[in-house]
């Protein structure tokens, strides 16, 4: 009888420990690419609606002190997931960072060439002998090079002006005639709020191959497929909920922090929704190969890697 009691007690303890283990959430550190904004909608909604929690995840969402840090911190094993950009991912891998793309957040470019609607640029050929502002050298100049090439304008026939992050202000003050690197869901709306009409030339229509604007990256030496499957499934559910309930989710998002509840973010919210990846875990291999070819042709990389070096499918 004593032995039977002991066996029963042991079985109960094991069952309790298994049940407790099954209900222990995976703690995950997610580094954002920038301060929280509508581009991060699915992440915030998955958190606020309890979607992450239901999947067994405890996500710590951290905006970076320096936007250049998240990929480096993931590479160093100091964070589990980071949000980054496909164009920068190519460069990071060529620099030797052990990172890879595991999912997509925003599936179209947001970058555009922004001009004043009543300004001198009516067609891209009008860029000849004009001033073009930029904030990041290298990548943005490569994008601009492709745009100019399609417009049959020699890149030596334009003047490049580093305006740092003052993109729309430098355009509105007519310090420059156009800016590259402006986000179509933000700077265009910022100008509208200030009573200035702008116009975007969409780079994917003007010679630049389409790419994923925002992606999820991890350290390629430490890929937790179970955790990432739960994470990407949660992002997919949150994205579907946003698309089905845009007004409700705007209220949820804007209540996440009082700084988010403003006119610019509300306008950007609705402009960003069509850009979210409906299948975050899906991988367009050709998209990564094609952009690698583009960077090679523009001279930003000296050799080409296959897509397997840059991106994987978790399931």
Residues covered by each model-derived region:
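Pocket-lining segment of extracytoplasmic ligand-binding domains
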Residues: 87, 166-256
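Short, glycine-/small- and polar/acidic-enriched structural segments
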Residues: 27-163, 168-173, 177-185, 200-201, ...
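Periplasmic-binding protein-like
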Residues: 39, 105-115, 196-220, 232, ...
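C-terminal solvent-exposed extensions
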Residues: 292-315
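Bacterial N-terminal signal peptides that target proteins for export
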Residues: 1-9
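Short helix-capping segments at alpha-helix termini
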Residues: 51-54, 150-155, 194-196, 226, ...
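Secondary-structure end/capping motifs
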Residues: 224-300
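Hydrophobic h-region of N-terminal signal peptides that target proteins for export
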Residues: 13-22
């Amino acid at each position: 009888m004593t032995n039977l009691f002991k066996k029963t007690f042991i079985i109960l303890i094991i069952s309790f420990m298994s049940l407790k283990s099954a209900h222990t959430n995976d703690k995950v550190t997610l580094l954002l690419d920038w301060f929280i904004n509508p581009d991060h909608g699915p992440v915030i909604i998955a958190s606020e609606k309890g979607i992450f929690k239901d999947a067994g995840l405890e996500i710590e969402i951290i905006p970076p002190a320096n936007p250049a840090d998240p990929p480096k911190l993931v590479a160093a094993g100091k964070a589990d997931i980071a949000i980054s950009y496909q164009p920068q991912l190519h460069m990071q891998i060529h620099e030797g960072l052990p990172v890879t793309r595991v999912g997509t957040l925003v599936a179209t470019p947001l970058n555009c060439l922004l001009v004043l609607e009543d300004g001198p640029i009516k067609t891209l050929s009008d860029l000849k002998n004009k001033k073009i502002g930029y904030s990041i050298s290298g990548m943005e100049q490569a994008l601009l090079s492709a745009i100019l090439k399609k417009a049959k304008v020699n890149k030596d026939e334009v003047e490049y002006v580093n305006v740092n992050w003052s993109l729309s202000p430098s355009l509105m003050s007519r310090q420059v005639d156009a800016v590259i690197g402006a986000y179509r869901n933000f700077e265009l709306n910022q100008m509208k709020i200030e009573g200035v009409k702008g116009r975007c030339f969409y780079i994917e229509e003007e010679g630049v191959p389409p790419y994923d604007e925002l992606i999820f990256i991890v350290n390629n030496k430490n890929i937790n497929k179970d955790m990432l499957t739960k994470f990407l499934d949660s992002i997919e559910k949150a994205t579907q909920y946003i698309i089905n309930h845009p007004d409700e989710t705007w209220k949820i998002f804007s209540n996440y922090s009082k700084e988010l509840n403003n006119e610019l973010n509300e306008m950007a919210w609705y402009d960003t929704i069509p850009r979210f990846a409906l299948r975050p875990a899906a991988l367009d291999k050709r998209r990564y190969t094609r952009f690698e070819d583009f960077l090679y042709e523009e001279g930003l990389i000296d050799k080409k890697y296959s897509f397997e070096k840059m991106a994987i499918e978790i399931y």
